[in-house]
Amino acid sequence: MSIDNQIQVVLIDDDPHLRQALCQTLDLAGLKVLPLGEATGLTARLSRDWPGVVVSDIRMPGMDGLELLAELHGQDPELPVLLITGHGDVPLAVQAMRAGAYDFLEKPFASDALLDSVRRALALRRLVLDNRSLRLALSDRQQLSTRLVGHSPQMLRLREQIGALAATRADVLILGETGAGK
């Protein structure tokens, strides 16, 4: 079962008390949270265009946070993953950041630090997804311009109309003289 696009934060921590406290902090800030006790199987549940962020403990039984980070970034290298740990040291933080973590928080941390990092990560995620969408639209438009020859005002208008119609599920009937290349 895939994760709903309404979920903004997937929170993974094996400590149920801390998971509940962090979930409550994020809930009170108006964020929709999916709390999980383990990371196994998460990658299969997230689509490449899921609009949220992942907050994960590093040290957990089964799949740890660094393994999860590598797996998630194998599917989508631009997905923000925040790693938290109670056993932080400088080499671990450096390893996490080099692996592509968006942020690294050492427990105990202020709620505001988590909220600030999550909000910045969500803003970045929105920009990344908007950028992908715009690139796809530009690519589609460029493909159309290479297939339709001509630069007259009528051809430009035709390209615009085709672009607008392509986004709908309507049937289209093209009329014209025989041999005109309909």
What does each model-found stretch correspond to?
Residues 135-182:
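AAA+ ATPase active-site-proximal loops
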Residues 10, 49-55:
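Active-site beta3 strand of CheY-like receiver
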Residues 37-38, 64-67:
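Acidic catalytic/metal-coordinating carboxylates
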Residues 60:
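Receiver (REC) domain active-site loop signature in two-component systems and cognate sites
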Residues 44, 66-78, 95:
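Short amphipathic alpha-helix used as the core "switch/output" element in two-component signaling
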Residues 7, 16-34:
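Two-component/phosphorelay signaling modules centered on CheY-like receiver
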Residues 57, 85:
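Active-site residues of response regulator receiver
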